[in-house]
Amino acid sequence: LVAVCVSLLGAANIPPQPLNLQQFKNMIQCAGTRTWTAYINYGCYCGKGGSGTPVDKLDRCCYTHDHCYNQADSIPGCNPNIKTYSYTCTQPNITCTRTADACAKFLCDCDRTAAICFASAPYNINNIMISASNSCQ
């Protein structure tokens, strides 16, 4: 019982995932055959941050998505990390629900475009966990 309590206390310190990120993960699953985890630490831009020149088409998808989120920051009150939106998935088709909320529409379009891009881009296992200092100039 003590171990369970300690375990639960430790889990309480884990921050919740942003809802928008969860929606993006679900879109990736809808559009393609790879899980969202396949894109963590891929190339120079897939995952947190990014620098240099994208290494391939898939990495360019991540680069474009990063820049799309940067543009969303210019919409008053729009926070890409927490803003949610509505969409439908009929695999592999994703449709953003029409809304008057400019931020929600913009973010849904960013995520939809990226998910479709991921699904259509070749996946090169040699671009996983590459050295940013060597490959992302």
From Swiss-Prot:
Residue pairs linked by disulfide bridges in the UniProt entry: C30-C89, C44-C136, C46-C62, C61-C117, C68-C110, C78-C103, C96-C108
One of the GO BP terms on file: phospholipid metabolic process
Region forming the signal peptide: 1-11
Subcellular location: Secreted
Expression tissues: Expressed by the venom gland.
Cofactor note: Binds 1 Ca(2+) ion per subunit.
One GO MF term: calcium ion binding
Gene3D superfamilies in the cross-refs: Phospholipase A2 domain (1.20.90.10)
EC number: 3.1.1.4
Catalysed reactions, semicolon-separated: a 1,2-diacyl-sn-glycero-3-phosphocholine + H2O = a 1-acyl-sn-glycero-3-phosphocholine + a fatty acid + H(+)
Keywords: Blood coagulation cascade inhibiting toxin, Calcium, Disulfide bond, Hemostasis impairing toxin, Hydrolase, Lipid degradation, Lipid metabolism, Metal-binding, Neurotoxin, Presynaptic neurotoxin, Secreted, Signal, Toxin
GO cellular component labels: extracellular region
Active-site feature positions: H65, D111
Amino-acid positions noted as binding Ca(2+) in the UniProt annotation, renumbered to this chain: Y45, G47, G49, D66
SUPFAM superfamilies found in the cross-reference section: Phospholipase A2, PLA2 (SSF48619)
Self-association and partners: Monomer, or homotrimer. Was firstly described as a trimer, but has been reinterpreted with the possibility of being a monomer.
Function recorded in the entry: Snake venom phospholipase A2 (PLA2) that shows anticoagulant and neurotoxic activities. PLA2 catalyzes the calcium-dependent hydrolysis of the 2-acyl groups in 3-sn-phosphoglycerides.
Name of the molecule in the record: Basic phospholipase A2 3
UniProt source species: Bungarus caeruleus (Indian krait)
Upper classification of the organism: Eukaryota, Metazoa, Chordata, Craniata, Vertebrata
